[in-house]
């Protein structure tokens, strides 16, 4: 009786083979569809078995367990067979590695604490790369792209960054003594607590860069040239000779470059006792 109830299962599988192409072209959707049909098939077969047991009363609980194991094995085999067309995770990871970086828009290379001294990496793409605490002494990075890269605490003594794109980079606490920044673009870069003593900055663009006040004053003593890419004068990008002080101050030294503070009372008016009410 148990074997006679197996006949509906091949009939269902034939229906699946004919209609699978119309349900979905994706192997994943076909797998879900196949599982659903198998579940419905198992339910119908169990109902048939229950009705036959009611009529004849010849099937025991052992036969019922055997029938369930047969259905489970059939469903497992169907799942394994249908999953052969689904791309493996290894293939997806390989595709992501080929695109490089976050959403394929950068190198995301890792050079943290790496020894890159006296190496040549000119005209390369280091966008969003990590150079934290890297040794970059006397290396050649001319013409390379560092847009959005991390260079905190890197040592770049006498390194060549001429013509490089260093915009939007984090370069705080860097050692850039005697580094070559000729015609480099450092727009919106963060250079707080970095040492640029003796650096070559002819034609460099420091527009909206965050630089310590004392470091900026030292660079303004010999800043010259115009950046060939942005057309911005180096002295103008540093704010050299500007009589107008920054109203907000520099993040590294707000009290030195910002206007004197006006102390307000609890009601929002200036406290005459402070002596700062007449400050303009």
UniProtKB/Swiss-Prot annotation:
Highest taxon above the source species: Eukaryota
InterPro entries per the UniProt record, alphabetical: 5peptide_repeat, Thylakoid_lumenal_pentapeptide
Record's keyword annotation contains Transport: no
Pfam families: Pentapeptide
Annotated keywords: Chloroplast, Plastid, Repeat, Thylakoid, Transit peptide
Domain Pentapeptide repeat: 124-163, 169-208
Coiled coil: none
UniProt key word Membrane: no
Subcellular location: Plastid, Chloroplast thylakoid lumen
Residue range covered by the transit peptide: 1-59, 60-90
Main location per the UniProt record: plastid
Classification via SUPFAM superfamilies: Pentapeptide repeat-like
Any GO CC annotation of this UniProt entry: extracellular region
Role summary: Pentapeptide repeat protein of unknown function. Subject to degradation when reduced.
Subunit and partners: Interacts with thioredoxin. Interacts in vitro with LTO1.
Protein name, entry field: Thylakoid lumenal protein TL20.3, chloroplastic
UniProt organism field: Arabidopsis thaliana (Mouse-ear cress)
Top-level taxonomy: Eukaryota, Viridiplantae, Streptophyta, Embryophyta, Tracheophyta
